[in-house]
């Protein structure tokens, strides 16, 4: 079954040994419009590029040194902005509270003003309960598709039967 887009109801150190050069995955996305067909690195790259389109400065982290962070971004808006840590999960199944707890701990450890957890699937009620009243945004598959569409990227999420 294919998810539909759902409209959501949300000084940066650019020299860091965790950062890697990233490619522009968006130019190749037309060839593989199903996000579930991207490998994990391509998906993380897509998320980094998306947040750049949203208006953030963003850097992809090295897998071996990410400390639970896939993208470190900076939101330049006065008062509302700051350092943002982003975790990308290309999942078929429900993302539970443990992933949100991990992101929150990483966010505090990194001194970030916000954490964003992005998934191709959806979150369980316990994940939303934990994130409530915290500077954490949970972006599910429908909201991700909506955000991509808002920035001119037509994509879809179709879960293959054998994917976990």
Language-model features: locations:
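Mixed-charge (Asp/Glu-Lys/Arg
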Residues: 1-164
């Amino acid at each position: 079954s294919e998810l539909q887009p759902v409209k959501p109801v949300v000084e940066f150190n650019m020299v860091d040994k965790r950062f890697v050069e990233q490619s522009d995955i968006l130019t190749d996305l037309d060839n593989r419009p199903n996000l579930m067909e991207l490998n994990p690195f391509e998906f993380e790259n897509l998320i980094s590029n998306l947040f750049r389109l949203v208006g953030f400065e963003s850097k992809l982290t090295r897998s071996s040194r990410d400390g639970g962070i896939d993208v470190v971004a900076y939101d330049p808006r006065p008062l509302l902005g700051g350092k943002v840590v982003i975790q990308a999960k290309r999942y078929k199944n429900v993302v539970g509270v443990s992933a949100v707890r991990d992101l929150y701990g990483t966010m505090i450890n990194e001194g970030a003003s916000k954490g964003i957890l992005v998934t191709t699937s959806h979150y369980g009620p316990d994940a939303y309960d934990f994130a409530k009243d915290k500077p954490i945004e949970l972006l599910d598959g429908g909201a991700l598709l909506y955000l991509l569409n808002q920035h001119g990227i037509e994509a879809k999420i179709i879960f293959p039967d054998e994917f976990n």
